[in-house]
Amino acid sequence: MRNKAKGFPNPISFNGNKANNADEHASKRPDGTTRDRPQERMRSSNHFNSL
């Protein structure tokens, strides 16, 4: 069965909830350019934990 047939709720939006250090680990700079080393950025953030 598909999700809608089972009665799952609509997707949740997180408006206004932003981590304190989200700008430091963002994929884009304020001027719109992409950061060069995304793997290092992910390792430095607290969202990715290696075992």
Curated annotation (Swiss-Prot):
Which processes are annotated in GO (biological process)?
asexual sporulation; sporulation resulting in formation of a cellular spore
- Cellular component terms per the entry's GO annotation: endospore-forming forespore
Give the span(s) annotated as Disordered.
1-51
Stored InterPro entries: SASP_SspK
Q: What induces it?
A: Expressed only in the forespore compartment of sporulating cells.
The domain of life is Bacteria
Signal peptide (from-to) = none
Q: Where mainly located?
A: other
- Ranges of Basic and acidic residues compositional bias? 21-43
Name the UniProt key words of this record, in alphabetical order. Sporulation
Q: Where in the cell is it found?
A: Spore core
Concerning NCBIfam families, the annotation shows: SASP_sspK (TIGR03091)
The UniProt family comment states: Belongs to the SspK family.
The protein depicted here goes by the name Small, acid-soluble spore protein K
Upper taxonomic lineage: Bacteria, Bacillati, Bacillota, Bacilli, Bacillales
- This chain is encoded by the gene named sspK
